[in-house]
Regions:
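Short Cys/His-rich Zn2+-coordinating modules
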Residues: 13-22
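Conserved beta-strand positions that form and line the central face of beta-propeller blades
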Residues: 11-14, 122
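A short glycine-rich, His/Asp/Glu-containing loop-to-beta-strand
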Residues: 109-139, 145
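Sequence/structural segment immediately N-terminal to covalent heme-attachment motifs in c-type
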Residues: 27-32
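Short acidic-glycine-tyrosine-enriched beta hairpin
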Residues: 163-169
Length: 169
């Protein structure tokens, strides 16, 4: 797969620092799994972050530190949004970071019909302002006119489309 559009360095750096919400992290992690150019930027950001952590003064650990730590993590809620996938449908390519978020039923993705040639699969991800989903668009299908509120990021996993200005594949 040839990657022709890339997330901004700012998004990659935010992902590397752990500052992105889950919805945007899914997109960036999926992109990084396919794009060595952006993966190099990510790896450099992680190296810089590691160097910065090395320069931080260490904190004193008391006799009760470990007990306090384990008390905190014992009370953390489990994240129900991440569900391990079952078998991947035949002839379907899904990058690993995305695969764990897909709900399969009998080895198939549960697509919701949106119109002729249009299917949608919602992905649960915690985010205050973003949604994640898969669109399956049959060749030659025109996407109905629709509005956008906020910022939209799209990642083409297979095939391609044009919006009248740019071609995405």
């Amino acid at each position: 797969m040839t990657v022709s559009h890339h997330p901004t360095e700012e998004l990659i750096l935010s992902y590397a620092s752990g500052a992105l919400d889950e919805a945007n992290s899914i997109l960036i992690a999926t992109h990084l799994s396919l794009c060595s150019e952006c993966r190099d930027i990510y790896n450099a950001a992680e190296s810089i972050g590691g160097e910065l952590l090395d320069d931080i003064d260490t904190a004193e650990i008391t006799n009760t530190s470990f007990d306090e730590f384990f008390s905190i993590i014992e009370h953390l809620p489990l994240d129900p949004a991440i569900k391990p996938s079952t078998s991947l449908p035949q002839n379907t390519f899904l990058p690993n970071p995305l695969r764990d978020y897909i709900n399969f039923s009998n080895g198939k993705i549960n697509w919701r019909w949106l119109g002729p040639g249009l299917r949608y699969h919602s992905i649960e991800a915690s985010s205050e302002f973003a949604k994640v989903g898969l669109l399956k668009i049959s060749p030659g299908t025109k996407v109905p006119h629709h509005g956008h509120s906020g910022k939209e990021m799209t990642m083409v996993i297979s095939g391609g489309y044009t919006d009248g200005i740019d071609k995405f594949s």
